[in-house]
């Protein structure tokens, strides 16, 4: 008899849960919400960036009681790999939302290139001041003017140099080095100013180039270097923080304005929480114990690679950090790039960033 009662209770609970989900779905449809909101994500789900997108989708579903369901499309699947078109497609409403890089939005939002000025930002403290200061707000305002609704910051990280030829410590070491870079013109200008030979190519072609010895190096954040196992191709890493690659959660503005305030608030809260999680993933082991503790205490998450520098060294890589004097030499060598791009970014935004860092 007792077992029969237990079975009835389990059945009743299952029916109740099903009813809750059905009611959520019905209420979502009645409110005019889509069954699925498509989210553009450049990388795959196993990268920190991809993990942040997954966390965002999970949190939005939880905080809206299942009314808003986001499906991340990884590897720029919605764009057939054309990641630089992401902000345009979101603005048009072809794609609902994105977790995107400042690199990708910079053709539409040139103010975002303030993060890509060579050797302009050098640490997490200054990065946070700029993101959360007047310069960061100027970028968000520029996005709103382009029919994009910014939600929260996240991070891909400071981009570091790896190569198979030499431990880079001076601009002279860069001479003739054939380096794979992303298709942002400022990146190409920077490497040319350093005497390198920058090559814009997709990652698959770059790996083939590494294996064949026709491409010497590349630049990416540590959070990318570890999962792509860069140690298989390169011996040397230079931790030079030459520029940084923040991420932004954003939504189609027209669609966003139609959401009730309680839904907007829930999505904003989810974006901020997911951004904090993903940023901690990218900084773990690079900012002392700060991000490690955030992940453990706030998200109950333990890093598989808690010390990325040690990990690369254990894999046989030589990891070099620039001294202040060495960094100064790189700043001087790329001054022409800075001068060329300040006007294109907007001198007012650059000055705001300087003021943010001075606070």
Name these PLM-found stretches.
Residues 131:
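Active-site-adjacent segment of FAD-dependent monooxygenases/related oxidoreductases
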Residues 31-126, 135, 144-359:
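N-terminal secretory/targeting leader peptides
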Residues 1-36, 358-359:
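Short, low-complexity disordered leader/linker segments with a strong preference
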């Amino acid at each position: 008899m007792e077992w029969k009662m237990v079975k009835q209770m389990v059945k009743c609970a299952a029916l109740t849960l099903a009813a809750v989900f059905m009611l959520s779905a019905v209420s979502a449809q009645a409110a005019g919400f889509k069954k699925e909101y498509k989210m553009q994500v450049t990388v795959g789900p196993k990268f920190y960036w991809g993990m942040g997108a997954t966390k965002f989708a999970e949190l939005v579903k939880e905080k809206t009681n299942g009314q808003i369901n986001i499906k991340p499309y990884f590897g720029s699947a919605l764009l057939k790999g054309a990641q630089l078109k992401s902000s345009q497609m979101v603005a048009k409403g072809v794609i609902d939302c994105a977790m995107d890089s400042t690199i990708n939005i910079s053709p539409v939002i040139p103010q975002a290139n303030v993060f890509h000025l060579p050797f302009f930002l050098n640490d997490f403290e200054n990065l946070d001041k700029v993101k959360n200061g007047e310069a960061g707000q100027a970028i968000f305002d520029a996005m709103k003017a382009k029919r994009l609704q910014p939600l929260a910051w996240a991070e891909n990280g400071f981009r570091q140099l790896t190569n198979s030829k030499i431990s880079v410590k001076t601009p002279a070491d860069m001479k003739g080095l054939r380096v794979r870079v992303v298709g942002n013109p400022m990146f190409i200008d920077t490497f040319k100013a350093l005497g390198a030979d920058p090559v814009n190519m997709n990652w698959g072609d770059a790996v083939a180039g590494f294996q064949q010895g026709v491409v010497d190096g590349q630049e990416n954040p540590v959070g990318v270097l570890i999962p792509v196992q860069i140690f298989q191709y390169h011996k040397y890493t230079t931790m030079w923080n030459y520029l940084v690659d923040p991420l932004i959660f954003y939504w189609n503005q027209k669609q966003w304005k139609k959401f009730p305030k309680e839904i907007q608030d829930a999505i904003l809260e989810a974006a901020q929480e997911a951004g904090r999680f993903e940023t901690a993933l990218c900084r773990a082991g690079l900012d002392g114990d700060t991000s490690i503790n955030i992940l453990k205490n706030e998200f109950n998450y333990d890093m598989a690679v808690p010390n990325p520098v040690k990990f690369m060294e254990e894999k046989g890589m030589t990891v070099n950090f620039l001294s202040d004097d060495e960094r100064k030499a790189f700043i001087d060598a790329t001054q022409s790039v800075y001068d060329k791009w300040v006007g294109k970014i907007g001198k007012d935004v650059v000055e705001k960033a300087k003021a943010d860092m001075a606070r």
